[in-house]
Amino acid sequence: MAAKNSSVTEFILEGLTHQPGLRIPLFFLFLGFYTVTVVGNLGLITLIGLNSHLHTPMYFFLFNLSLIDFCFSTTITPKMLMSFVSRKNIISFTGCMTQLFFFCFFVVSESFILSAMAYDRYVAICNPLLYTVTMSCQVCLLLLLGAYGMGFAGAMAHTGSIMNLTFCADNLVNHFMCDILPLLELSCNSSYMNELVVFIVVAVDVGMPIVTVFISYALILSSILHNSSTEGRSKAFSTCSSHIIVVSLFFGSGAFMYLKPLSILPLEQGKVSSLFYTIIVPVLNPLIYSLRNKDVKVALRRTLGRKIFS
């Protein structure tokens, strides 16, 4: 399959580095990241599924965040690892569009899941008496469907705009994956309208969750400052700060990559920026949201205890 009015049937992914001496060390480094991502997120999914006391709105969203991170990483990392060990990392046009679609779907869905999690924490801390009513099963399901719906819409918009481009002789993608901006650069017709579509869709898909997340955490911190003891403040600040760091990495690197004109941001810098939301954040999420979480630690001990004594 080729693009509309295009002679290109496959692409070559350039990868992360041109230096042969770095390929093997980087292969093992990112293989390690991928292993931690898979084990951490699948472990968290299993724990939440097996322990009924974790069947609450917070862990409902965390379950889906871990599922997205696992799928997201699996969409990107295996093909990226191939670029370190093969001379020419070829991907078919269909394979490239499929990777692009799922990349967009998971990254947009994660944006809205993170905003739903921030809203859940806001209600739990600032309006605890209304929590069970505000975060009912129906509301949680609607928020989840909204997140996946926005992910699907964003993926269709981006993939559709790329498939309508014309690709000529050049098929070398200056990236370790099929991403929007490197593919726009390969187009041999004007990509102005496509860049405009990217900017508008990303502004919505990043802007709405960012506003929700940071307003929620600002209200949480304000409530903590006014109502908590010194010890409670310290614990809450520690938890909120770690969450905000991960969220800032995810949204900040995405905004840095996509909310600038193609001519301003060199793609070499874009590749490095992409590492944060494609590799680093899926590794950090299960660590931040589980190892610092008392309920998850208790669930882990109970689960391991049942396995040992069964």
From Swiss-Prot:
Location(s) in or outside the cell: Cell membrane
Pfam families from the xrefs? Answer: 7tm_4 (PF13853)
- Would you say which domain of life the source belongs to? Eukaryota
Signal peptide bounds: none
Q: Which residues are glycosylated?
A: N5, N164, N189
- Keywords (A to Z) from UniProt: Cell membrane, Disulfide bond, G-protein coupled receptor, Glycoprotein, Membrane, Olfaction, Receptor, Sensory transduction, Transducer, Transmembrane, Transmembrane helix
Query: What Gene Ontology molecular-function terms does this entry list?
Result: G protein-coupled receptor activity; odorant binding; olfactory receptor activity
Q: Which residues lie on this side of the membrane: Cytoplasmic?
A: 46-53, 120-138, 217-236, 292-310
For this protein, the record's InterPro entries field holds:
GPCR_Rhodpsn, GPCR_Rhodpsn_7TM, Olfact_rcpt
The segments annotated as topological domain Extracellular are 1-24, 75-98, 160-196, 258-270
* GO CC, any one term: plasma membrane
The regions listed as transmembrane in this protein's record are: 25-45, 54-74, 99-119, 139-159, 197-216, 237-257, 271-291
Keyword Ribonucleoprotein tagged: no
GO annotation, biological process: G protein-coupled receptor signaling pathway; sensory perception of smell
Membrane association type: Multi-pass membrane protein
Keyword Oxidoreductase tagged: no
Q: List the disulfide bonds.
A: C96-C188
Give the family this protein belongs to, as stated in its UniProt record: Belongs to the G-protein coupled receptor 1 family.
Q: What job does the chain carry out?
A: Odorant receptor.
Protein name (database record): Olfactory receptor 8B12
Organism listed in the record: Homo sapiens
Traced from the root, the source organism's taxonomic lineage reads: Eukaryota, Metazoa, Chordata, Craniata, Vertebrata
Identify the gene encoding this protein: OR8B12
